[in-house]
């Protein structure tokens, strides 16, 4: 458990952890490339290590170090055993598609209790459109998933754009193996598009090209066939999702902090956290590779469309508790499909602290109360809730006890140590 007490001031320089999204994609691309790739500044978090270990089961050789992963990639082979991806939905979804392109045999992918509840049916249906054979062993669209190797026989696939972007990423990373050019057609407007831009960016670095289709009656992506993944040296940038908790702490508390390893020109959608706190009234300075904050700031409630930034919702919910007026979060139906139903979880747990928060079908309405009280909070094995609630606890009167703090190893393994280094009053017990 994590015990958090009111923190009077934070001060110091700290780095945002490497991007989870970029690390996942880079290690899988490198594993598919015939040759040696050097991945610098990878995230050594549980989810990304799940991707690395899964790729090793498909035949990649990976030397894992804190500052660099050396990946010797090759054509994927049939795994000798069931591929257990732990708690990583990204790993499960990307490798479900790619495992269909091994030369022979079957792949079985599964994970922990949480993963075995995450929806997979839209991806399975899309792969079946391509002529591939895959299914849920429970016949309910969840893991364990069985995938049979096979050739892609149809080159147009339709899929909703408003479910999980990970389904589309899986198709993007699988279709370059087709003998013919392919199209992914989106049947509904895209949500979480920045994650697809990250996929396209990483694929480009590893030699795979994807073009966007933007026609009057057709939106999607075009992928040339017979493309080869090529090895490269790749540096992974800092993670704006993880940096959002540092930003929130900086604008709410008496602070003087510099957050390094976040880039002004990043393609990450969650860089929007900077614009959000500015619109709420914070004078945050964004430089080429760092953010400077000298708080606290008097915040005002605003309306925020979270279509492309679902991972920021817990951070926004905490900010809204201390803002003047109402903070409205909308277009967030997909936020319910993360590690837990984050809309329900934020409502339930922050209310225990005295927050005035209303859950809507697609979002939240938070009325600023300016003061929270310590409470015992559940986090539903969700790393983002642990970190967002920590910031709430640092602002609250009394003591806040947060369960499940070990889940931060997924995306920000040294979160507690870094927060303590700048003066946060937190302890693991």
Swiss-Prot record:
UniProt keyword terms in alphabetical order: Amino-acid biosynthesis, Aromatic amino acid biosynthesis, Cytoplasm, Transferase
Entry keyword annotation includes Cytoplasm: yes
Compartments where located: Cytoplasm
Pathway info: Metabolic intermediate biosynthesis; chorismate biosynthesis
GO biological process, one term: aromatic amino acid family biosynthetic process
Catalytic residue list: 311
Oligomer status and interactors: Monomer.
Function: Catalyzes the transfer of the enolpyruvyl moiety of phosphoenolpyruvate (PEP) to the 5-hydroxyl of shikimate-3-phosphate (S3P) to produce enolpyruvyl shikimate-3-phosphate and inorganic phosphate.
Record's protein name: 3-phosphoshikimate 1-carboxyvinyltransferase
Organism lineage string: Archaea, Methanobacteriati, Methanobacteriota, Methanomada group, Methanococci
């Amino acid at each position: 458990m994590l015990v958090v007490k009111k923190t009077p001031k934070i001060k110091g320089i700290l780095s945002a952890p490497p991007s989870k999204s970029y690390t996942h994609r880079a290690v899988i691309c490198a594993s598919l490339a015939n040759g040696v790739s050097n991945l610098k500044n990878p995230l050594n978090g549980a989810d990304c290590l799940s991707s690395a270990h899964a790729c090793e089961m498909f035949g990649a050789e990976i030397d894992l170090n804190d500052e660099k992963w050396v990946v010797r990639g090759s054509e994927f082979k049939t795994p000798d055993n069931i591929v257990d991806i732990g708690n990583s939905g990204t790993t499960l979804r990307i490798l479900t598609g790619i495992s269909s392109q091994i030369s022979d045999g079957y792949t079985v992918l599964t994970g922990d209790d949480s993963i075995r509840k995450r929806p997979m049916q839209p991806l399975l249906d899309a792969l079946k459109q391509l002529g591939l054979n895959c299914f849920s062993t429970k016949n309910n669209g969840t893991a364990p998933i069985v995938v049979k190797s096979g050739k892609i026989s149809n080159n147009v696939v339709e899929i909703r754009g408003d479910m999980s972007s990970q389904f589309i990423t899986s198709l993007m990373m699988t279709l370059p193996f087709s003998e013919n050019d392919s199209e992914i057609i989106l049947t509904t407007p895209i949500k979480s598009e920045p994650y697809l831009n990250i996929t396209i960016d990483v694929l480009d670095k590893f030699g795979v090209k994807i073009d966007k289709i933007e026609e009057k009656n057709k939106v999607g992506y075009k992928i040339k066939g017979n493309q080869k993944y090529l090895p490269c040296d790749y540096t992974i940038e800092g993670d704006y999702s993880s940096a959002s908790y540092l930003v929130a702490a900086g604008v709410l508390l008496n602070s003087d902090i510099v957050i390094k390893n976040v880039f002004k020109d990043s393609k990450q959608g969650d860089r929007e956290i900077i614009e959000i706190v500015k619109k709420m009234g914070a004078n945050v300075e964004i430089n080429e590779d760092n953010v400077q904050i000298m708080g606290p700031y008097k915040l005002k409630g605003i309306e925020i469309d979270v279509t492309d930034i679902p991972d920021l919702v817990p951070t926004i919910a905490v900010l809204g508790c201390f803002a003047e007026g109402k903070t409205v979060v909308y277009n967030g139906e997909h936020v319910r499909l993360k590690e837990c139903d984050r809309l329900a979880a934020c409502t339930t747990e922050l209310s225990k602290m005295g927050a005035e928060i209303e859950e809507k079908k697609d979002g939240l309405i938070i009325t600023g109360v300016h003061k929270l009280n310590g409470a015992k909070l559940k986090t539903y094995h969700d790393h983002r809730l642990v970190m967002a609630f920590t910031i709430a606890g640092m602002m609250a009167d009394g003591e806040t006890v947060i369960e499940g703090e070990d889940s931060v190893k997924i995306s920000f393994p040294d979160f507690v140590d870094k927060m303590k280094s700048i003066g946060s009053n937190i302890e693991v017990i």
